[in-house]
């Protein structure tokens, strides 16, 4: 078996803001395998300052994977515990290699194009007018669940944006999720959540920064809005530690990004730990290209979750890979008549 990797820079169509800053581009790496005339491809992508494997020896580790590809998937994954995004790329590349086609990883009614999956529409942070125009565009596009990034502009103005939505659509028509990316201070998080609760929100992601276990546990005890852990799950290895974290905090939901939590296997460990405690979950992409998004979407469909997933990020870039994934009326579907085009990766 031969393996190589290629770095690729994804360019955002518009600067995209979170409470951690504004992104104009995103680095990713493609891991390519070749054996007996068949090819496999996986994506290894990090989010700077967030991924636990955002470290100087990242590319060196990718080279090590290529040099040692004959160790096989399981042994490689065991050696890559501290590089969850490379675990995801390795899992996907090996699956791609043995699949009927390199991109049909989990054959299903979804990949046949006969069914679709509900997703949330993502509204990025920015100036009030920009956020308002995104909200209007998502609602016109048929989304029934939207997710707003909050914590970057003045909180009162963010409340006004929520008021704008609720004046036009009640919670029966539009489900709203908010993502604070840890922007609230522990001392005023509860008060802010109480103000947000007036707008009948589905959930709030990561209201305070990760690794404040006792403060997060208190917030989760009787929250005005259900709390979903996100960044809190990063860098937690092994099923015992996953169980322990969820038992301590007892959140209402967890959000799983395969590139940040150790690929499909790490995601399945978190789901098992959550379901034991009756904690809900959904899966989101971590701004991967369509290569990674396709893998995550097919995997997610196979798990049969009824909640809207966070998989609507394929249209963010000017130089993404053409693929059969399509979004229509708040649903993501796979159109088998559309072809993959990975020429710009060559």
Residue ranges of predicted features:
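Catalytic core of soluble alpha/beta enzymes
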Residues: 153-294, 298, 317-328
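Short glycine/serine- and small hydrophobic-enriched flexible loop segments
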Residues: 96-100, 272, 298-301
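Short helix/strand-capping turn motifs
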Residues: 304-309, 313-315
């Amino acid at each position: 078996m031969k393996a190589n990797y290629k770095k690729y820079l994804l360019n955002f169509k518009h600067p995209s803001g979170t409470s951690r800053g504004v992104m104009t581009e995103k680095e990713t790496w493609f891991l390519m395998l070749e054996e007996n005339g068949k090819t496999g491809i996986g994506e290894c992508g990090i989010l700077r300052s967030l991924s636990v494997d955002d470290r100087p020896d990242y590319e060196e580790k990718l080279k090590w994977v290529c040099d040692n590809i004959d160790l096989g998937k399981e042994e490689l994954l065991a050696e890559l515990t501290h590089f969850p995004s490379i675990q995801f790329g390795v899992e996907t590349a090996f699956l791609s290699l043995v699949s009927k086609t390199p991109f049909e990883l989990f054959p299903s009614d979804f990949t046949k194009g006969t069914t679709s999956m509900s997703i949330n529409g993502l509204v990025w942070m920015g100036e009030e007018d920009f956020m308002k125009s995104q909200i209007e565009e998502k609602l016109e596009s048929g989304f029934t669940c939207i997710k707003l990034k909050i914590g970057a502009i003045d909180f009162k103005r963010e409340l006004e944006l929520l008021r704008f939505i609720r004046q036009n659509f009640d919670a029966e028509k539009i489900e709203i999720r908010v993502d604070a990316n840890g922007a609230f201070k522990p001392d005023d998080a509860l008060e802010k959540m109480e103000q947000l609760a007036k707008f009948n929100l589905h959930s709030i992601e990561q209201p305070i920064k990760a690794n404040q276990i006792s403060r997060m546990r208190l917030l989760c005890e009787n929250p005005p809005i259900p709390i979903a852990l996100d960044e809190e799950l990063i860098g937690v290895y092994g099923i015992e530690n996953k169980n322990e974290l969820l038992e301590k905090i007892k959140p209402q939901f967890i959000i799983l990004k395969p590139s940040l939590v150790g690929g499909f296997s790490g995601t399945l460990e978190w789901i098992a730990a959550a379901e034991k405690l009756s904690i809900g979950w959904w899966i989101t992409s971590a701004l991967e290209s369509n290569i990674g998004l396709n893998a995550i979407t097919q995997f997610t469909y196979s798990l049969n979750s009824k909640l809207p997933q966070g998989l609507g990020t394929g249209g963010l870039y000017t130089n993404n890979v053409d693929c059969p994934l399509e979004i229509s009326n708040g649903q993501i579907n796979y159109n088998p008549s559309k072809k993959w085009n990975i020429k710009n990766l060559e």
